[in-house]
């Protein structure tokens, strides 16, 4: 009897353990896979679309809370990876807008973000319940607020979202309803696009329209105050976050030589601005930001996160290198180094042959392998007869998948929509005849519009097949089906003919190199010192880059590397470009 009992117990443990292994993940991939809200402040457009932007992420009593523009609530996590949505007892009817959040000594959590711009500071000691109360005062003319209480219990508010006005700040009286302590605020940060190339407006910084400064956030580190801000516009690939550094909360502040400190202009998911910086597991900082999608509407957006560091000289930088490929998750503390947490899994599906059960001519199935967040495939019908098959062209080791769903001509989804889910089966094959299941979501009840799936063990495959079962709404529309792993061929050889020509307008540089055979793309890296190449731009389908994000009078150092599905070439360095 005892032997039988022990055997059954062992089998149960083995079964539970296998389930745990199957769903445990040690990596993540941008865009973040959240159950984004359908905002309705633009319902007059007649389009339903998901969006998430301007994340304010704070730690509170060892857990994390994320407040996001127009979301009708907020998210909670124990590990910065797995987020569950909280519908609070009390909240803004229209959803908060560009919110601020601050943890005051683990006693109360403060938040503000009234869309009207006139607001009380809200507080609670139970954010899971969401019984928010209002401080009995109203602060006016606050766009994109940021709230900060220093170690000495002095409180400050920062704000700004304008192409006319600067980021401003003022001290509040923590003992008297957080009323302002001075009649006039301090003007703290102005954009200088004539000097700082990255602050110029437009896609790739090519517009002469006056840029926007917005989204402040304050981080105190080693006694210094890092006042962060976003520019030049949320609807562009070059939306990023810069930083000024000072010795006191209201400055004076000095422009950091390495700027923008968080910047993701190339690749699949572009944009990384209007964010927040939070200390996560193991004391490692994470910067959350905003990705631009801007198809249904210019403010259609997604969220991203990057490990963020302060180097030995106090330079703040986010690791956006391969920033939309799998990276180690925040709980993998020992693998988060100053060189970043890129997992090393390459993109196997880029530009590979693909076929489908059906397609609209205007949205062909080739869009699911083009590595462009703005394009998507639409099937003729939304039924369980639809499928997609990708030929990786060689047998490879598949480690992870990302499936991106899209809202196409939807008109009936508003706010927090119940029972949203995506149901499907993903299979793999070596020969296109015999198939094995990689991921079975046919009975899923989870809303996962950017579902990232890390396999419990690598799968040998040449063909990947998506078999559709159900999505809500009128249409089946999918962006990229991204397959990550390692090919079994050769890495690219090192780049040759690498040149950087700084323009007479020092904000610009023309970077070029000779094409490398068998390459998917290239990473161009640059920085203000040979050991500070903290910025990078992923380039597909070209062997040149017009870089327009440099600072007048600042020396820069550059490097380039090639990559494909098999790995990354040796990096080629250029000592200096004046």
Q: Where in this protein do the model-derived segments appear?
A:
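Short beta-strand elements bearing conserved aromatic residues within extracellular beta-rich modules
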Residues: 170, 424-426, 522-524
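Predominantly extracellular/luminal regions of secreted and cell-surface proteins
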Residues: 168-180, 335-371
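Aromatic, loop-rich ligand-recognition surfaces of beta-strand-rich domains
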Residues: 370-439, 449-497, 502-504, 514-517, ...
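Short S/T/G- and acidic-enriched coil/turn segments that sit immediately N-terminal to beta-strands
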Residues: 242, 422, 451-452, 541-546
């Amino acid at each position: 009897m005892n032997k039988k009992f022990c055997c059954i117990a062992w089998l149960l443990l083995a079964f539970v353990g296998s389930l745990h292994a199957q769903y445990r993940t040690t990596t993540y991939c941008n865009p973040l896979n959240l159950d984004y809200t359908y905002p309705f402040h633009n319902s007059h457009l007649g389009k339903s679309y998901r969006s998430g932007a301007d994340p304010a992420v704070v730690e509170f009593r060892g857990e994390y809370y994320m407040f996001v523009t127009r979301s009708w609530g907020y998210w909670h996590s124990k590990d910065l990876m797995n987020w569950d949505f909280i519908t609070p007892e009390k909240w803004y009817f229209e959803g908060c807008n560009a919110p601020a959040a601050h943890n005051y000594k683990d006693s109360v959590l403060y938040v503000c973000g009234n869309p009207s711009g006139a607001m009380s500071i809200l507080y609670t000691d139970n954010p899971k319940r969401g019984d928010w109360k209002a401080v009995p005062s109203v602060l006016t003319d606050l766009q994109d607020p940021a709230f900060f209480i220093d170690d000495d219990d002095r409180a400050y508010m920062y704000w700004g979202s304008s192409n006319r006005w600067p980021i401003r700040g003022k001290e509040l009286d923590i003992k008297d309803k957080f009323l302002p302590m001075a009649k006039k605020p301090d003007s703290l940060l102005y954009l200088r696009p004539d000097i700082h190339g990255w602050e110029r407006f437009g896609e790739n910084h090519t517009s002469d329209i006056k840029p926007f400064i917005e989204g402040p956030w304050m981080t105190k580190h080693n006694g210094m105050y890092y006042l962060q801000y976003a520019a030049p516009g949320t609807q562009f690939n070059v939306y990023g976050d810069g930083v000024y550094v000072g010795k006191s909360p209201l400055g004076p502040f000095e422009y950091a030589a390495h700027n923008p400190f968080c910047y993701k202009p190339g690749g699949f998911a572009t944009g990384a601005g209007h964010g927040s910086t939070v200390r996560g597991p193991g004391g490692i900082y994470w910067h959350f930001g905003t990705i631009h999608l801007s198809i249904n509407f210019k403010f259609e957006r997604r969220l991203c996160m990057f490990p963020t560091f302060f180097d030995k000289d106090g330079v703040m930088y986010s690791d956006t290198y391969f920033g939309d490929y799998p990276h180690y998750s925040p709980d993998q503390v020992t693998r988060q180094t100053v060189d970043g947490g890129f997992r090393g899994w390459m993109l196997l599906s880029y530009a590979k042959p693909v076929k489908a059960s059906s397609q609209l001519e205007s949205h062909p199935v080739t869009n699911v392998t083009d590595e462009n967040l703005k394009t998507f495939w639409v099937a003729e019908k939304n039924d369980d007869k639809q499928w997609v098959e990708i030929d990786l062209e060689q047998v490879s080791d598949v480690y992870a998948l990302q499936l991106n769903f899209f809202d196409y001509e939807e008109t009936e989804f508003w706010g927090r929509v119940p029972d949203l889910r995506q149901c499907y089966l993903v299979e793999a094959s070596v020969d296109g005849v015999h198939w094995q299941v990689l991921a079975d979501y046919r009975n899923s009840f989870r809303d996962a519009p950017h579902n990232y799936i890390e396999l419990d063990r690598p799968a040998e495959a040449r063909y990947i097949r998506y078999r559709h079962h159900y999505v809500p709404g009128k249409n089946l529309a999918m962006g990229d089906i991204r397959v990550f792993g390692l090919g079994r061929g050769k890495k690219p050889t090192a780049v040759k003919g690498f040149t950087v020509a700084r323009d007479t307008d020092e904000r610009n540089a023309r970077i070029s190199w000779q094409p490398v055979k068998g390459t998917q793309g290239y990473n161009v890296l640059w920085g203000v010192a040979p050991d500070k190449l903290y910025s990078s731009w992923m380039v597909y389908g070209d062997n040149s880059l017009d870089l327009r994000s440099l600072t007048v009078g600042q020396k820069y150092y550059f490097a380039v590397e090639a990559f494909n599905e098999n790995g990354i070439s040796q990096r080629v360095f250029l000592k200096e470009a004046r």
